[in-house]
Swiss-Prot record:
It is an enzyme of class 3 (hydrolase). Gene3D superfamilies: Isochorismatase-like (3.40.50.850). One of its GO terms (molecular function) is nicotinamidase activity. InterPro entries: Isochorismatase-like_dom, Isochorismatase-like_hydrls, Isochorismatase-like_sf. Keywords: Hydrolase, Pyridine nucleotide biosynthesis. CDD domains: cysteine_hydrolases. This is Nicotinamidase 3. GO terms for biological process: pyridine nucleotide biosynthetic process. Its EC number is 3.5.1.19. It holds the Pfam family Isochorismatase. It catalyses: nicotinamide + H2O = nicotinate + NH4(+).
Amino acid sequence: MASSSTRKYETRKRDPNSKIAALLVIDMQNHFSSMAKPILNNVLTTIDICRRASVPVFFTRHNHKSPTDHGMLGEWCNGDVILDGTTDSEIIQEIQGQVTGPDEMVEKNTYSAFNKTRLQENLEKIGVKEVIVIGVMTNLCCETTAREAFIKGFRVFFSTDATATFNEELHEATLMNLAFGFAYLVDCDKLRRSLLGN
């Protein structure tokens, strides 16, 4: 059964195709653990479903290596950015074991997983035409990545129950906006049915 948010906001229905899809797990890091922990089981479930369906999985890690790469985030966050090499920058322990190779990790220093990374190139190289977005924060890095994926020509599926942010109001605003113009909404149950047939 679809989650209430999926039913409430979805405007179009479509299932992802495991042959051309990839999963993007956004910023499941210690810095965001208060938001990430409540959705951890759904994130792990989604990763498991995708692995069982032979859907490639990519993880992002947000971090800053020097003051020169802070960009507007430095101003917006009053300099409180995630610094590389700190505990805050590390992927949370429960997710670390899911990362199976260096090609799966995308290092980024802004909201988008596509900006100044090789993500698009790596997706296109393996024939990916659809992306499934999960992780944190719903309304910042997840939403920006989803919107940019759409603009770049990828079909986007956005999880309602494996994404999270500061509060439900911001979370639902993103779901409403993405469903209106950028993404098909999915949840763990819908992904299980569409990718595994059960």
